[in-house]
Design a protein with these regions (language model features):
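Residue-level preference for long, well-ordered alpha-helices that form the structural scaffold
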Residues: 1, 5, 101-104
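Short hydrophobic helices that act as membrane-entry/anchoring signals
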Residues: 2-21, 80, 84
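Soluble catalytic domains of membrane acyltransferases
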Residues: 19-129
Length: 129
């Protein structure tokens, strides 16, 4: 049931984005040919890039991508339900340099490593934070 809801969600996202943007995706066939877990590390100069990339990659990658999302974005009230739907992981804010944030970051790294070893795929937008 969850997979059907996720497919519908990404379909609606693509439809909404199509109203404003023309997107051309090259190389999806190469992703479809991959077997096993995938770690995707795209760049995103605009805030619209993550939903655009995710909505198109969702169809291409055999295993659903689990995004890692910065905590400031993750907890935006209207985005939080979507974050839970797509099973995003929250990346803690390390700018405060707290021990709890560092521990959460280490736990997240361990979770991603275990996930990759277990066959899961992830998408991480490196931002230097």
């Amino acid at each position: 049931m969850r997979a059907v809801v996720e497919k519908m969600f990404w379909f609606v996202v693509r439809l909404i984005l199509r109203l404003r943007y023309r997107v051309r995706v090259d190389g999806l066939e190469q992703l479809r040919a991959l077997t096993g877990p995938v770690l995707v590390l795209p760049n995103h100069p605009c805030y619209i890039d993550p939903p655009t990339v995710l909505s198109h990659l969702y169809r291409a990658v055999q295993v659903p991508l689990r995004p890692l999302v910065y905590s400031g974005t993750y907890h935006v009230p209207f985005l939080l339900p979507m974050m839970k739907l797509i099973r995003a992981f929250e990346v803690p804010d390390l700018s405060a340099q707290s021990q709890s944030a560092a521990a959460q970051a280490q736990q997240l790294i361990d979770t991603v490593v275990e996930g990759i070893e277990g066959g899961n795929s992830f998408i991480i937008y490196p931002s230097g934070r």
